[in-house]
Amino acid sequence: INGATGSAGQLAVQIARYLGAKKIIATGRNAQTLAALDADECIQLTADDKTLSGQFSATSAAQIDVVIDYLWGHSAEVLLPALAKYTPAGRPVRYVQVGSLAGADIALNGAVLRSAPLVLMGSGIGSLSMPHLLAATGEMLQAAVPGKFTIATTPRPLQEIAAAWPRDDSQKRTVFTLG
């Protein structure tokens, strides 16, 4: 999970664990948040490119099935070539691009896609049909209690919506309360 220290990434770690992922590898910049995650391995994105490439290469060699990327940007530019070069042959890696907190664009050599079974996918409004999106949302809502999913929230009265709406915080989600 690339970008596991934001609220969506932290939730993704919990969901992956609930769904039975054999090994969860989490990346992020905040060392304290990374350490608190229920991940099997953590990679701190504040390292230099050579160190990151080495860490991504080592994890890729251990067979990654799915990457959920909330960051895109520079970390994807370092991660994708490592996946292409070191992923064992025969099993594709699904790379799901969800967010772009680290940048909307990346530079990617076409050879990366030709040299390995990488499947790039997007997840967002439009990537799934409405019936599939509603079904998946329903499944996650049904799993929330037995999975004990939690996220950090900031409660705000509904009358403060105009002031609170533009304040985006990837660490906490704003929850509007009535009354």
Model-flagged regions — what are they?
Residues 16, 67, 79, 120, ...:
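Terminal peptide-recognition signature
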Residues 1-48:
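Mid-domain Rossmann-like dinucleotide-binding core that forms the NAD(H)/NADP(H) cofactor-binding site
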Residues 41-51, 152-160:
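Short acidic-hydrophobic, aromatic-tinged amphipathic segments that line or gate anion-handling sites
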Residues 65-68, 96:
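N-terminal Rossmann-like NAD(P) cofactor-binding module of classical short-chain dehydrogenase/reductase
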Residues 74-148:
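Glycine-rich phosphate-binding loop and adjacent beta-alpha segment
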Residues 49-62:
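Short amphipathic alpha-helix with an adjacent loop that forms part of the alpha/beta core around
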Residues 131-179:
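C-terminal hydrophobic helical "lid"/dimerization subdomain
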Residues 39, 63-64, 92:
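Local beta-strand N-terminus motif with an aromatic residue
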